[in-house]
């Protein structure tokens, strides 16, 4: 895989792209698992230079590590992603995760530990279980994250519907 053709080797890279083609807990529509490869394909068509930031993506040192393969269960995805991100951070590189459904956000926060997050979502995803007896799903991810980091470090934008 190549992220938009902006590729260097792993050793010199500053940014490591990881795809997480996962949508096992989606309940309305599936298909988020196709996003990582679709985003990569679309990245081939971007203009590389930004007048606003004076940054040319072509100058960034990006390595695409491909897609996470530990996807058989929610738990294996979370643990595999968390371990992968931890390794990338130990090497003083910046992980860039493209997914998939937002349950994967838990794996990212689990690896980062001391972070804040901004969530763009129409729902708060604060259910304790969804569906019944399922602790890790797209509808519970913000609640699970709030068990890892302070609620003061979570900002939700775009919320239009919640559950009591």
Language model: regions and residue ranges:
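Conserved alpha-helical scaffold segments that buttress catalytic/binding sites
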Residues: 1-164
């Amino acid at each position: 895989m190549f992220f938009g053709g902006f590729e260097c080797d792993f050793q010199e890279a500053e940014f490591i792209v990881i795809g997480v083609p996962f949508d096992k807990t989606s309940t309305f529509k599936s298909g988020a698992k196709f996003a990582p490869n679709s985003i990569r394909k679309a990245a081939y068509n971007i203009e590389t230079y930004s007048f606003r930031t004076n940054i040319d993506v072509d100058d960034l040192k990006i390595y695409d590590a491909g897609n996470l393969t530990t996807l058989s269960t929610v738990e294996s995805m979370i643990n595999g992603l968390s371990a992968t991100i931890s390794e990338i951070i130990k090497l003083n590189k910046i992980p860039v995760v493209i997914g998939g459904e937002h349950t994967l956000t838990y794996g990212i926060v689990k690896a980062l530990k001391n972070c804040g997050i901004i969530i763009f979502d129409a729902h708060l995803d604060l259910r304790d279980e969804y569906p019944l007896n399922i602790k890790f799903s797209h509808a519970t991810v913000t609640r699970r994250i709030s068990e890892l980091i302070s609620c003061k470090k979570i900002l939700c934008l775009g919320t239009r519907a919640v559950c009591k």
